[in-house]
Amino acid sequence: MFSPRTEIENLRREINRHNQLYYVQDNPEISDSEYDALLRRLKELEEAHPELVTADSPTQRVGAEPLKAFGIVNHPYPLLSLANAFSDTELEAWYLRVKKLLGNAAFQIDCEPKMDGLAVALTYRNGKFTTGATRGDGFQGENITRNLRTIHSIPLNTEEDAPPVFEIRGEVYLPKEGFAKLNRERADKGLSLFANPRNAAAGSLRQLDPSVTAERPLDIFIYALGYAEDSLLPDSHWQILEYFSRLGFKINPRNRLVNTLEEAKEYYREMAENRDSLPYEADGVVFKVDSVSLQQKLGDAGREPRWAIAYKFPAEQVTTLLRKIGISVGRTGTLNPYAILEPVNVGGVVVKQASLHNEDDILRKDIREGDTVVIQRAGEVIPEVVAPVLAKRSPESKPFSMEETLFNPKLSRPACPVCGGEIYRPAGEAMHYCANVSCPAQFERQLEHFVSRGTMDIRGIGESLSVILAQEGLVKNVSDLYYLTAADLLKLPRMGEKSADNIIKAIADSKSRPLDRVIFGLGIRHVGNETAALLSSRYGDIWALAGAGLDELQTIPDIGAKIASSIKAYFSEEKNIAVIRRLETAGVKLASDQKPSYKPLPLSGVEFVVTGKLDSLSREEAQQKIRSLGGTAKDNVTKATRYLVVGADAGSKLAKARSMGVKELSEQEFINMLEQS
């Protein structure tokens, strides 16, 4: 007769072995009922002896108390994103670039299906799974350890010869069969259906109650080692994955190691042809240089490794009926045509609408109401109308006309679909506009823009709340935001005290945003974030900018007659000046920390490009310093580029700059130039 401790330890070993056989090797030795009997006996013993329960017991995969929120995990080594290729030509360019950087040295290529799931990092210490985190922004992720413990193909402990501390990375996914079953169960319960397996996997992993996650048939494939301490591992990605497979981790059996570019292309073609028959969603193939030492030699370019690339599958195309061409109103009065479609599933997402850009684009493609059209999700994300199916076109169809579509019989003229204002199309522009500056739809979009992350970044006020605030009359111009109270917000439906307090705090916090954000947030036509930064550094004060003349504005690099006229027109409107005065009264910062300068700044007219990693400041900080001194910071080298600031691991921009004779500056030379300016 075994002691309870010994029987518990034996049961755990046996159950873990059967988990490995069933979930990882797909080779079960016992029936489900026999497995359930083992697990039931272990639960009975642990309930009788709670002091013997451990975190890595198979019984602990389910049943933990719900969390109130996820904690944050810092990734010791960033989870980088991958550069994309969309054609054989782009794949060949990557291959030749790698070959050149390696001095034409031969290298093998790992080929792996690009799973459409959620990337996670799993940390093990002394053989035990201790922490699991989402990818997040690559540097920080959410702590979802308890939810990951419910996935049977993730070992809770490893073999004795595993490294003492290591992080391994994988893709959590929901198999197609499991996804279909999950949606059938939700339909039976009257619940909303998941749009695609990726959304279902994401929603499952982010449940605060791990028992909900445990009910979902999630799985995982390990695709990379993050790091390992005190361990001599092979200099081969392929062999490292084989090693971790022996430790009990699940590796995709469709991975392949090849020696040539042609073999890599053949692998891609095979995967693309068999995409629909795969038991999981995949949106491409990942190619990696196999040698770890060569990976380290190649390094990273920004947030992408040079030694890997994702070759995406072609966008999935389907046909559906274009019921109607609708028109929406943008924040600057643009009238934006869009397709209203018979709902259709494209790549796992139900698409009901798609952008049509402008009248010229519609006429170029000859898209008409009532057409059967080809739809694709560009980059697997944005729905796009590719073309009409002419063979199915009705002989009664008519070419699209913006003015006919917007014709208002009551007004006997084309009119804005929201306010009835007159419409116009400026010479040389593709867009039509609503002439009514008081159009409510324009203001709703303006408010959304003002509070968005890239401008005043007011957390808690998104698209839907912006519309409600405008329609309820609580906010009639952007300055009204700064006079709202929690009591005002509590009058709105489904608004709680805590949410109201958080929004008021976020509004107060936004008062100290930099001047360029305020300028961008005002929504001046043709003034994007880069132009706003130029204006901020040139004038340093909103009132100085408001008083600038047309000729003076056009002396600023990259500001021509059209932008200058738009700026002048904005500040000539008394209602806009009144809004700015109210912002000032509310305490919004309307001057930059830099002393205003009405003389040409030291770097006026000088264009810079920054490449590589700088030690003393980030690329964004370097660009900001350039702009603050009147210079222009661009992302690409052109004939207009005066200087290329070169940091560590400089990429293709360096070669291009040298071929064009652009002057190079080291980081120290760049800093010296800034200090002297």
From Swiss-Prot:
It comes from Dehalococcoides mccartyi (strain ATCC BAA-2266 / KCTC 15142 / 195). InterPro entries: BRCT_dom, BRCT_dom_sf, DisA/LigA_HHH, DNA_ligase, DNA_ligase_AS, DNA_ligase_CS, DNAligase_adenylation, DNAligase_N. PANTHER family: CHROMOSOME TRANSMISSION FIDELITY FACTOR 18, DNA LIGASE. DNA ligase that catalyzes the formation of phosphodiester linkages between 5'-phosphoryl and 3'-hydroxyl groups in double-stranded DNA using NAD as a coenzyme and as the energy source for the reaction. It is essential for DNA replication and repair of damaged DNA. It catalyses: NAD(+) + (deoxyribonucleotide)n-3'-hydroxyl + 5'-phospho-(deoxyribonucleotide)m = (deoxyribonucleotide)n+m + AMP + beta-nicotinamide D-nucleotide. Keywords: DNA damage, DNA repair, DNA replication, Ligase, Magnesium, Manganese, Metal-binding, NAD, Zinc. CDD domains: BRCT_DNA_ligase_like, LIGANc. The gene is ligA. GO terms for cellular component: cytosol. NCBIfam families: dnlj, PRK07956.1. Zn(2+) binds at residues 416, 419, 434, 439. Its cofactor is Mg(2+); Mn(2+). Belongs to the NAD-dependent DNA ligase family. LigA subfamily. NAD(+) binds at residues 32-36, 81-82, 112, 135, 171, 288, 312. This is DNA ligase. The keyword RNA-binding does not apply. Its EC number is 6.5.1.2. Residues 598-677 form the BRCT domain.
